[in-house]
Amino acid sequence: MSKSSPIEPVSASDVSQQFRDPGLYLNRELSQLDFNFRVLAQALDEQVPLLERLRFLCISCTNLDEFFEIRVATVRHAQEFGLPPAPDGMRPTVILNAVHDLTTKLVHDQYNCWNQVLCPALASLGVGVLSHNSWNVRQKRWLRGYFRNEIMPVLSPLGLDPAHPFPKIFNKTLNIVVVLNGIDAFGRAGHLAIVRAPRSLPRIIELPQHLSRDGSQNFVFLSSVLSAFVGELFPGMVVKGAYQFRVTRNSELVVDEDEVENLALALRNELVTRGYRLAVRLEIAEDCPIPIVRTLLQNFGLQENAVYRINGPVNLSRVSQVYDMVLRPELKYPPFNPRTVRNSDHIFEIIAKGDVLLYHPYDAFTAVLDLLRQAAADPDVLAIKQTLYRTGKDSTIVDALIQAARSGKDVTVVVELRARFDEEANLGLADKLQEAGVQVVYGVVGYKTHAKMLLIVRREGRKLRRYVHLGTGNYHSGTARIYTDLSLMTANAAIGKDVHQLFLQLSGLAPKMKLECLLQSPFTLHAGVLFRIERETTFARKGCPARIVAKMNALNEPQVVRALYVASQAGVQIDLIVRGACTLRPGVQGISENIRVRSIVGRFLEHSRVYWFANNGTPELFCASADWLERNLLRRVEICFPILNPDLAKRIYSDVLQSYLDDNLNAWELGSDGVYRKLLPETDHAPYSAQAALLESL
């Protein structure tokens, strides 16, 4: 529908009825699996350096693990409790079957990529990851000795009989089920045994180079060594078969925060049992006999649609260790030197003169570290307040906060204990900070604190001035080198006041307060996004140019999706850059033909969130910690901050939005059929990669 077509405003109830058709929505779980295919495509791209292709393969495997631990576990929960279907109309049982079909193809493609493409390519360049049948005599002799000296002493094989029931198997660990024939020392007839590989054992073993005939750097999987020599654990018995397997379990921690008095203690108790929760997936060697598979399924409480046959090591993601162990720069992305802030030794003076925008990893994260380090050492700084979601193991951020507290400054840190898979690390972090005198709070009951905020209060003359850092990504110097994220450092008084009020809400019992500049979940961000989408819709109905460009990691919030459909019908031109799952179906005639959705998958993980609204010639641009997901907009503490400096807003539009819309090398476009297709340069267009162009500009 063209933007000049007369469209009558519709009521909310009419909109709800109009967009009730399940065919207008894509399934979140299947869309998330689609993203893994796009990551895997990078592993097959011959333009990508070989060891980087290996890393992309491992990322796709790790992503799939987390998908089962969280998303599939959630769907199984919905199935168990008979929860209603999502807007796409798919019921949990249908979703699980569809997930199985799509995952089976993904797993096949992953192992085909490893066995047929990457492993042979690495071998041709002198990096061998050797299977059992390719060991030479000297390698096999060395590995037998390694097994006897380093592996065998820590193994505890368990024969299965009435006195030895099926053992507890920890989440995502390597195990071998062994079929035995013979009589043991106590006269028991052998049948099945389980060998668990302790997590203390290395999953990748490097062979001494002198064992190679051609000087190659060679590795073997622990699973290959176990399978080859497992018979030594059962002397006098015949091993009829040894099959590796791995079980994946529900890893979503569940704590009733309204019922617990001590959140940290409750989480510690949950973490103890997390590795043994309900199973959601069984990976098993493809040659394992069906009766044994059924035995495992029965013990794990799984159905046939939870089994995945594996043609290779069940823990394929562990081959990522080879990336770090092979020191071959020509097989990796070339290093780069990110931009640094000039005169960063005087960071407060720089920020006082004007807002500072950083686009990581092209701009170094060291500027953020400098800000905090200088604040910790500056006698004029009176207070520091910060949120921490993920920080990494050796965090300069944490060290600076501790230094500040020990120097007598008032330091308050909101540590989110429920950051997925970082709960244990954050519990330790909270303890460390508290021991140093930092006031630690755990956020708000019922809401994860996902906002990225740093507030520094500094005395300047007779006044106190607030300095603020806001970001789309974590305070994590490691991910800042491989994730794209935006940082704003500002001394803007209105923004500083808003951030101060947010910290009062998080650390105390302050009531909801009206903010001047920032939008905040769970209070104003959802409504603020809807308002701006509807404003563009109104402009389009009046015949004015109207446009929305938004970049995020994922999109599924139903009201936002419906508002975008209404905007499209009114003629608003909408470009969405959504890296991962997207439930909106673009390009549907009469509904969403004015919406285009693309996903960028390249060297760096796209992580920044940016919302741009044309606003009838007075554009508004926001950066945010939140995706357009239900959880982010309604069930988390998030921030969305405006870029008030017009020059900085133009830079973001150019480098972060338009640049990605021009990309024709790393872009995938979502069709109305729900299929992502890789874009290729047209004959009259030069090849263009947004990430490569930004690197070249350094």
UniProtKB/Swiss-Prot annotation:
What does the UniProt PTM comment say about this protein? An intermediate of this reaction is the autophosphorylated ppk in which a phosphate is covalently linked to a histidine residue through a N-P bond.
- Which amino acids does the record list as binding Mg(2+)? R390, R420
Q: Which GO MF terms are attached to this record?
A: ATP binding; metal ion binding; polyphosphate kinase activity
- Which residues does the entry assign to the active site, renumbered to this chain? H450
Instruction: Choose one Gene Ontology CC annotation of this protein and give it.
Output: polyphosphate kinase complex
First-level EC class: transferase
Q: Does the keyword Transmembrane helix apply?
A: no
Give the source's domain of life in one word. Answer: Bacteria
- An example Pfam family from this entry, by short name, is PP_kinase_N
The record's HAMAP family line, in alphabetical order, gives:
Polyphosphate_kinase
Tell me, what does this protein do in biology?
Catalyzes the reversible transfer of the terminal phosphate of ATP to form a long-chain polyphosphate (polyP).
> What's this protein's family per the entry?
Belongs to the polyphosphate kinase 1 (PPK1) family.
Under which name does UniProt file this protein? Polyphosphate kinase
Q: Provide the species name.
A: Xylella fastidiosa (strain Temecula1 / ATCC 700964)
GN (gene name): ppk
